[in-house]
């Protein structure tokens, strides 16, 4: 008996601890770090061949004898799952723009200006070091911010980071990634499929029309959203942008407003009380079942579709998509002399561009926006926050790796670029995290004048 009670107590403690862990903001960041370490170990072990072979295997869906669709596992992760990641980030960003921290033009323009500076300065640093060499083709490499890793580090810091700063980073990183996607489309893509691109924009237009005409059923949005993603996948433009476009179209106004909900709920509760006074069995009384179902339906219809979709995806995003993404992309082989890598113009351009250029550009353009009066930051944010988030934005990683593969054919240049990206991203993550941990006084007034 006593042993049984102790066992139940132990199980209860373990369950409670696990629940608290999964509820913590840091859990997603911890999963991300573990996944990154696993990927690096696999890529530098005897299983490296099997690891890369697995990612290159095709996952095919056959709908009929003449209709099938397949991508490699790596493509499903980077082009498919990451589109969902961008959807979640886009939903959060839209919510903040509509009713949150970015609801004013000045507050919304601050991260956009920061993103512009965070792209321009790293590119200029790289160009200045590589002008006149074949390495110049890699000028777009240090421009990118890896939104998944950046948000993962912010999540790892938990409540030491103000919520407003996370919102700022999301807006900055999405703008940065859209900029990187445009750079890829304009300067690194061999050709665009205008038919698919036009079809994708048509799907986007249809989604906007659905929103405008008051369609609230998420099923229809998801169906058209999948078509939107497929069109961009085949257009020559990175399909993750489809996630952002899809998020823009999701309605934020609920099907049932609060006034009508209040009236209906009051009526339903009154009717329910009448059935209870008659002492009817709820399992046998169909009237009670109908009333309870009506209350449930009305409550569900009072929730904005945007929040429904965001809440349904947030845990899947944090505990599955981001770790899987890390396992698939962090596997860089460390088989070169690190000193030689970062001392050459290519490696140095990437290293300085990401680790120094990002924070410099973000800081300068934020200051310009403040001085010109075109942007403003939340009162809880100060210069240390901007420097810290600017450094974390220097985590280029996957988008930088993607541009590397487009910019160079020489395997030696690709290897140097990848190692430099990894080192720069690591320095940026550590530097930014340390600064933000030292600046965890959320209540300080804004000193960005």
Swiss-Prot record:
Concerning Gene3D superfamilies, the annotation shows: Na+/H+ antiporter like domain
Please name the GO terms that the record assigns under molecular function. Answer: sodium:proton antiporter activity
Pfam families (alphabetical):
Na_H_antiport_1
One biological process term from GO is: regulation of pH
Keyword Transmembrane among record annotations: yes
- Chief subcellular location equals membrane
Location of this chain's protein in the cell: Cell inner membrane
Q: Which Gene Ontology cellular-component terms appear in the entry?
A: plasma membrane
Q: Does the keyword Nuclease apply?
A: no
Task: Give the transmembrane region(s).
Answer: 30-50, 69-89, 112-132, 138-158, 168-188, 192-212, 218-238, 241-261, 312-332, 348-368, 386-406, 419-439
Which reactions appear under catalytic activity for this entry?
Answer: Na(+)(in) + 2 H(+)(out) = Na(+)(out) + 2 H(+)(in)
The record's annotation in InterPro entries points to: Na/H_antiporter_dom_sf, NhaA
Keywords tagged on the record: Antiport, Cell inner membrane, Cell membrane, Ion transport, Membrane, Sodium, Sodium transport, Transmembrane, Transmembrane helix, Transport
Question: How the protein sits in the membrane?
Answer: Multi-pass membrane protein
Its biological purpose: Na(+)/H(+) antiporter that extrudes sodium in exchange for external protons.
**Which NCBIfam families does this one have?**
NhaA
Per the record, the similarity remark reads: Belongs to the NhaA Na(+)/H(+) (TC 2.A.33) antiporter family.
**What name has this protein been given in UniProt?**
Na(+)/H(+) antiporter NhaA
- Which lineage is the organism of this entry classified under, starting from the top rank? Bacteria, Pseudomonadati, Bacteroidota, Flavobacteriia, Flavobacteriales
């Amino acid at each position: 008996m006593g042993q049984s009670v102790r066992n139940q107590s132990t199980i209860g403690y373990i369950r409670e601890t696990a629940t608290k862990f999964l509820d913590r903001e840091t859990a997603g960041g911890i999963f991300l770090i573990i996944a990154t370490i696993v990927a690096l170990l696999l890529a530098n072990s005897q299983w490296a061949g099997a690891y890369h072979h697995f990612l290159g295997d095709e996952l095919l869906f056959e709908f009929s004898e003449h209709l099938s669709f397949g991508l490699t596992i790596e493509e499903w992760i980077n082009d498919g799952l990451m589109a969902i990641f961008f959807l979640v980030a886009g939903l959060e960003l839209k919510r903040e723009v509509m009713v949150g921290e970015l609801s004013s033009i000045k507050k919304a323009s601050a991260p956009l200006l920061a993103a512009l500076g965070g792209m321009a300065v790293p590119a200029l640093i790289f160009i200045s070091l590589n002008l006149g060499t074949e390495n110049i083709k890699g000028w777009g490499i240090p421009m990118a911010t890896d939104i998944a890793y950046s948000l993962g580090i912010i999540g790892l810091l938990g409540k030491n980071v103000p919520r407003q700063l996370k919102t700022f980073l999301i807006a900055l990183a999405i703008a940065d990634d859209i900029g990187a996607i445009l750079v890829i489309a304009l300067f690194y893509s061999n050709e665009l499929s205008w038919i698919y691109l036009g079809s994708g924009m048509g799907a986007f237009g249809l989604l906007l029309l659905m929103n405008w005409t008051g369609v609230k059923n998420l099923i229809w949005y998801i169906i058209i959203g999948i078509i939107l993603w497929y069109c961009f996948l085949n257009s020559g433009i990175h399909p993750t942008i489809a996630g952002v476009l899809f998020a823009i179209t999701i309605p934020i106004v609920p099907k049932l407003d609060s006034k009508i909900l209040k009236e209906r709920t009051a009526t339903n509760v009154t009717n329910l009380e009448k059935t209870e006074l008659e002492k009817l069995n709820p399992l046998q009384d169909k009237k009670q079942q109908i009333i309870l179902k009506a209350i449930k339906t009305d409550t569900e219809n009072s929730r904005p579709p945007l929040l429904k979709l965001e809440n349904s995806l947030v845990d899947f995003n944090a505990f599955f998509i981001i770790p899987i993404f890390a396992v698939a992309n962090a596997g860089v082989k460390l088989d070169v002399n690190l000193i030689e890598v970062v001392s050459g113009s290519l490696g140095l351009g990437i290293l300085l561009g990401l680790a120094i250029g990002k924070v410099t550009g973000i800081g300068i353009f934020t200051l310009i926006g403040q001085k010109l009066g075109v942007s403003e930051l939340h009162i809880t944010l100060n210069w240390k926050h901007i420097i810290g988030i600017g450094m974390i934005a220097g985590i280029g990683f996957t988008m930088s790796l993607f541009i590397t593969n487009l910019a160079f054919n020489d395997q030696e240049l690709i290897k140097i670029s990848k190692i430099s990206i990894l080192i720069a991203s690591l320095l940026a993550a550590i530097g930014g995290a340390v600064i933000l941990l030292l600046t965890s006084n959320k209540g300080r007034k804004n000193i960005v004048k």
